[in-house]
From Swiss-Prot:
Name of the protein: Heme-copper oxidase subunit 4
GO cellular component: plasma membrane
Disulfide bonds, paired cysteine numbers: none
Top EC class for this record: oxidoreductase
Source organism of the structure: Aeropyrum pernix (strain ATCC 700893 / DSM 11879 / JCM 9820 / NBRC 100138 / K1)
Length: 103
C-alpha cells in the first residue's frame, strides 16, 4: 500500500500547480499558433498570449519558491529551469514583438 500513498502524494503535488499549468500550456499553444499563422496579422493577441505565458511562469515560479529556498546555492534544478524559461521567454517576446509596433 506504500505505492498508493506515493501516488496520492504525487497527485496532491500536481494538483497544487494544475491551474497554472493549464494557463501555461494554453498560452504556449496560442503563441505557437500565432507564430505559425503570422504575428503581423494579430500582434496584440500575440502579445496577450506572451503576457499570459510569462505571468503563468511567474506564478509557477513563486508557487515553487514556497517549497524551495531562494538562495542561489540552495536552488534546485527545477527552480533554475523555471528561471531560465522565464528569462528566455521574456527576451524572445521582446525581440519578436518589437518590429511589429510603430516606433
Amino acid at each position: 500500500m506504500a505505492s498508493g500513498g506515493g501516488f496520492e502524494d504525487l497527485a496532491r503535488e500536481a494538483a497544487k500547480y494544475f491551474g497554472v499549468w493549464i494557463v501555461l500550456v494554453a498560452s504556449a499553444v496560442a503563441e505557437v499558433y500565432l507564430v505559425l499563422e503570422g504575428i503581423a496579422r494579430n500582434p496584440f493577441v500575440f502579445v496577450l498570449a506572451v503576457a499570459l505565458f510569462q505571468s503563468s511562469l511567474i506564478a509557477l515560479f513563486f508557487q515553487h519558491l514556497r517549497d524551495e529556498p531562494i538562495i542561489i546555492r540552495g536552488i534546485t534544478v527545477s527552480g533554475a529551469v523555471l528561471i531560465a524559461i522565464l528569462i528566455i521567454s521574456a527576451v524572445t517576446s521582446v525581440l519578436t514583438c518589437t518590429p511589429y509596433f510603430p516606433g
